[in-house]
Structure formats: structure tokens, C-alpha cells
């Protein structure tokens, strides 16, 4: 009996196992390896497009790297693009055949339109005649109307994303920034029964393999990632057992395996064998099996829901990408070795030290073995770039909570300082010397941390987790990439009020003050800074060598402003490990140069933006007074002064929430920071601890709850209602959905720049920009820099041609009604159909009309019609690799 043949070519491959046994081939999507890549076509902001061939038919294959989308937190946009194209069956929208993937890439296999994009055609023509522009705008308007009726907003409409078919018609493409209102995954019925195509033509029919590929999961998260959602609870149980040995909080010991030599491995093993039976040494973080238990796939680190969680690098004690051998995306460039030990401050620690020394190893040997820099005893000269290695701790004075636990936690981070920061450097050096002498007398084990700086630190410094104060006059160096025609992420948009420092949100939409997208230049700031720890509980390792996005746990402030500014809230069941920082931002201006993923907090005011800096961070405990009376363990608790109480009770400034590294959060290491709710600072019992000459640290407690020091790790605290949405009392512009502004500057609608809720009207605004560009050859709001473009958009500054170049009244009026600031009054499909400029358009038969330009390629693989845009924007496309 002959086997039944399948209806698809991609169904081949199954064979008959016996003479009398029939096997029906199961439809399956093809593999990307079945496609032959002919040549590159073009490159966009989030992927590259190649000309592919399979079975004698040509396809346009868009390749998107999963790692890039995870790092940019754009996985949901890849899903939205696939869904939007899969749901669309319109003659004016590019047809999607397959959605394929490999371990590293996502492949969207679409129809190849040989005519190139309209941007390239516009570069060749200079500008279009009115008749030609009207035909193109009419077809794009039909495409937008189709998308909007199906709940899809394009949000990146521009001539670059309009392709020309073989017959010269327009088809929209590049839905990478689109918004699909379908609040669920698409299924087979969505693909087969698109509402507008009750009886689809043969052109829109899809084979079973195509349908299966279009509804498949894109694999940004795997079953392993789902299991990791409960891994923190498992770790908490394990930590609970081991915490009985150390009677202290857990802090991870982070050692990069690639930097560990055989000698250092021997030292580590010796230390483990020596201190394991000793209950006075917290060795739980040195156990190797924890590394195995936390191993997970690299692709499991983010999903479409991951933006609601905080990075797991800080939130889970034993989770670090440096412990995972399978996460090797550029990690080889990092040459750091970081250690952080927490030793209980008890006389029994002396015995532990003696025990280690009896085996022939001491801490200095281990220190030298783990760091490639052996000359760590010499402190560099003040005012020069330096790396502080193995700084000594400050056991003389610790916070009240740490003293109750008999814990001495030291956290020293790498500090690359310039001459403007000699005060903080000198403070650290003096304290280290005094502490070394003090430790020699008391015989306690010292806490230490080794940080080896990497040559690539400047490259990855925008991925770090420090916060930099920068004066306003240092923010006007310009925008590095002066081209405004490419899709980009508008990372920083600061709206200012003309004529003074007012807080009236009604005036904040008048102009855009600055838009900066450049590398950090912390050396330019002349203000001396020092990093202050905002956490009451034990600090963890700052993880300086991680190239991924980290949450910040400290805020830089000048020496004269740090007093009475830090408020540390004790963790409760609802908000474990949250510290609150209240700072007067009227006295200084902050640089807004940061991305949403790199920020560790949610802005409470649109003017209160902070700058991410990888440089000036040094998390330290309050400096202890040299007076032995103050260092005595029976230190008195001083009552807060009236000035401090007034600051706490009368100040109504916005607060910024920071989450402790020890907080219990299930998260991925590439996720966006969560937006945490914050309890009111009013009505709290306040206790004050004074630590020598260092400024006060105010520790308010919740009313009605007595303070009990931690006897367990904060990871064991169950959070009651995390990630609650804040009450509707926010001043200023409403935040955008995901907090980011994505798109090309020239085509962004005002509501996007103002951070307001937006809808389909943003596409009609972009259509008005395209109409003006078709008629003149230049976008209406073009300027030299993006910030100037934004000012022109908000002012609606349109340079109308004059004289012989003057546009017709109908054309100018059509642009006017589309470029209306008020999105409620902006023209749409109905207004365009009634407009005099489109009076001669046959809207029902647009796809059958003769187009003014019909491509005439040399052969079917000709891509020359895309070259004009690529050359104008200096785009080069690299090779292809599976």
C-alpha cells in the first residue's frame, strides 16, 4: 500500500517502516536551514533583512537576534510584530508566510517586494508630484484603516517602512514597534478566519505548516524558566538550614570560574574543608552545589512578562550570570574577580583564622590567588584613576540592626576616581588605616572584597548600576548620532517649563529641553561625590563586573547634602528590603541620561531624572568615631533632632524607592525594574542612631509594630501584596505604557513626546508627516538634532514652501488636518475620504489602479531599489549566519 502524500512540501521526511504500515505525515513548519540565503537587503533598528530562496520562490527573511531583544527588553515587540503580520490579510500589508526560530534567532519569512522602499524612491525622485503623493498616501491610509479596525497600531509609520510591489503598489512592513490589543496569544482560528476576509482569496490561504509556524511560541522563555519562578523559595529553604550555622544574613560570594587558577581553587577547597565544620563561619555561599542548582538556560532570562520584575542578579542571593557557563554573551570580555565575605563579629572567629593558618593558607594568599593584581597594598595617589583592592572594613561602628545581630558587613566597591573626588577617597583611606590598626588589637576576621577592573569597563559602563549627579550645564554636549531618520529608542526626554522652576503640569508640554543619547562622561562633573549606602540590613556584593542591567542600591550626593537625607525603612511583610530616599532636588540639577532598563526606580516627577554612572560608587557603613567611648557596644541611641523630625513630617517631596539586594523577588537577569508601591512616610515611629562624626541615619518603624532584628535572611520574608499599582495621585504627565518612547524622531506624535496615552491617532499624525515629505522631499519638523526636532513638533513649527515651490491649498490643508496637536481633533480615514485632495481617488479599487512608478529590475534577485536608502543612511549589512 502506498503511503498517503501530504499537501505540503514541508511535510516530507517521514518514511514507511513496514510494507503493510501506512504513516500519515504530520504537517510541520520548515526549518530555516531549508532556505538558501541569497544576499542581504537592508537593516533596521532591531533586525536585518535578507533575500532567501526555497523551492524556487524568493522570500524576504527578517532575522532578529533573541539575545538583543532580551537585552533591550523588546521580546514582547517581536511577538507583537509576528502577531500583527499573521493577523493581517490586506493587499496593502506585507504577507507573512512563516515564523521560524533557532536557538539564537527569530526568522520572519515574508513576501519579497522587489520595488524597494519609498524612502529610496524619494531619494531618487527628490520629491513626488501631487498626483503621485496622493496615490501613495491613499493606499497607506487604507492599510492604516485596516490595521486600526483590527486593533493594531503601527507606531513606526515612515517612508522607510512602505515597500513597493512588482506592480508599484504600496505595502506596509516593519511592525516591530506595533501595538496589538489582542490580550492573548493568537490561535489557529485567528489565522484562518480574519474578520475582514470572510471568504479569503487563494492569495491569502496558508498551508498547515505556515499556520503552525505562525502560532508557535517564540521561545524567549522555556520550561526551565518556568521552574525558576519557584527556585527562590527552594533557595530560601536551603538558606534557612545553613543560616543556623552562621546566625547571620546571607551574602553571595561571587567568583568567576574563568578567572580561577588551579592554585586559587586549591585555596578555596582548603578554606571550605577548614571552615565547614565550624559554626562560626558563614560558608554557605561557598558551596559549589548551589551553583549547579541555579544553572539555567540563557534564553530563559526574559519573557514578555519579565518587565514587571527586578533583576535577579540582586534580588536572588545565589543567582548571578557569572555562575552560569551557558550564559557566555560577551562575558569573556569581563576580567573581574569579586569576593564579598561576611564574618560574624565574635571572638570565636579568631579560632577559625588560626585553623586556616594551620593548613598553610591565609587570607592574603587567597586574596593574591584570586586577583591578577598582586600589589594591592599600595594605595594610588589621590586624584588619579585607581582601583581599590582588598579595602579593610569598618568594624568599629555598625548600624543598630547589625549590632543586634553581631554582624559586621563590609561592602567595598571598585572606585575609579578623579581629582574632584579626593574627599571621599581620603575618607576611605583614613578609615581603612584606622580600622586595620583596630582589627590588629581586637583580633577579628576582616571582611574584604577583590575587584579587578577590566579594560572594557568604558564600553559597558552604561550597563552599571550607580547613579550620578550631573550639573545642568554639562548636559549640552550634543547628540552623537545626528541622524534623525532611523528608528531609535528615545531614552531621555525632559520636559521643562519656560520662565522658571514651576511645577505646573499644564505647562510642561510646551517644549522639550534636552534629549541626550551619548556615553557617560562622569569625569566632567566638578562636584565631589560619595556613595552612601541606603540599606539598613546587610549589604551584598555590588557585582561590579556584570555587564547586564543592574539595580542601584545607592545614591550619589555631595558631602554638604548627605546629612538628614537618607531614610531607611525597616522591611516588613509587605515591602521586604525597601529603602526610601527623600532628597531635595531643587538645589541641584540631575542629568537624565539613562534608559528605562538601567534605572532602578520609577520617576515620581518628570523633572526628577537621575543619571546612571558606572564610576563613583562605594557602598560603606557609617564611619565610626575614633573615640573608644563611642565604639563601645553599649552605644546610646540619641533622639532625632527637631530639624530632622521636621524634615520627615513636613516635607512633601516625592520619594524614590530602592529595593535591597537581599529582597525576595522572582525575576530574570535581563528584566526591567518593577514599579513598587511605597507606603507613606507620615505617621511612623522614628528611632535615631548616631555613629560618631558621620551624619545621622534615621530608621523609622511602622506604628504598632515593635522592632525585631532579623534572625533569618530577608529572602525568607513572604511579601504580601508586591507590585501594587500606586494610587492615582501622581503629578505631571501620565507615563507611557512601558515607559519608553520608541520610534523615529521626525514622525513621533506630540502625545508620545508628552508621555500621554496614545491610540491610532499617532499613525495619522505620521501619515501627515509622510504627505508633507512626499510633496517637499523633507519631513516638516526636520532639524539638526533630535531635541530640536522635538521642539519643532511640540511647537508645530512647519516651514511651508513659498513662491514657485508653494503647495496647493488642498495639499496644505490636508497636511494641516493630519498634523493637529489635539489627537481628538486629528483627521482620520473619514476626513480624508471627504477631503478635496482625495476627491478623485477610487477608494474601492485602489489595488487595481495604475501606479506612477513600476519597478523594472534586472532580474528577480535584484535589490538595487533598496540601495538608495542604505547609501543615504550609510547602512552596511553584514553576512548571515544561522
Curated annotation (Swiss-Prot):
It is found in: Cytoplasm, Cytoskeleton, Microtubule organizing center, Centrosome; Nucleus. This is Serine/threonine-protein kinase greatwall. It catalyses: L-seryl-[protein] + ATP = O-phospho-L-seryl-[protein] + ADP + H(+); L-threonyl-[protein] + ATP = O-phospho-L-threonyl-[protein] + ADP + H(+). Residues 35-838 form the Protein kinase domain. Signal peptide: none annotated. PROSITE patterns: AGC_KINASE_CTER, PROTEIN_KINASE_DOM, PROTEIN_KINASE_ST. GO terms for biological process: cell division; DNA damage response; female meiosis II; G2/M transition of mitotic cell cycle; intracellular signal transduction; mitotic cell cycle. Residues 839-882 form the AGC-kinase C-terminal domain. SUPFAM superfamilies: Protein kinase-like (PK-like). Serine/threonine kinase that plays a key role in M phase by acting as a regulator of mitosis entry and maintenance. Acts by promoting the inactivation of protein phosphatase 2A (PP2A) during M phase: does not directly inhibit PP2A but acts by mediating phosphorylation and subsequent activation of ARPP19 and ENSA at 'Ser-62' and 'Ser-67', respectively. ARPP19 and ENSA are phosphatase inhibitors that specifically inhibit the PPP2R2D (PR55-delta) subunit of PP2A. Inactivation of PP2A during M phase is essential to keep cyclin-B1-CDK1 activity high. Residues 713-736 are annotated as: Disordered. Keywords: Acetylation, ATP-binding, Cell cycle, Cell division, Cytoplasm, Cytoskeleton, Kinase, Mitosis, Nucleotide-binding, Nucleus, Phosphoprotein, Serine/threonine-protein kinase, Transferase. The active site is at 156 (proton acceptor). The gene is MASTL. It comes from the Eukaryota. GO terms for molecular function: ATP binding; protein phosphatase 2A binding; protein serine kinase activity; protein serine/threonine kinase activity; transmembrane transporter binding. The modification Phosphothreonine is found at residues 207, 222, 521, 725, 744. Phosphorylation at Thr-744 by CDK1 during M phase activates its kinase activity. Maximum phosphorylation occurs in prometaphase. Its main location: cytoplasm.
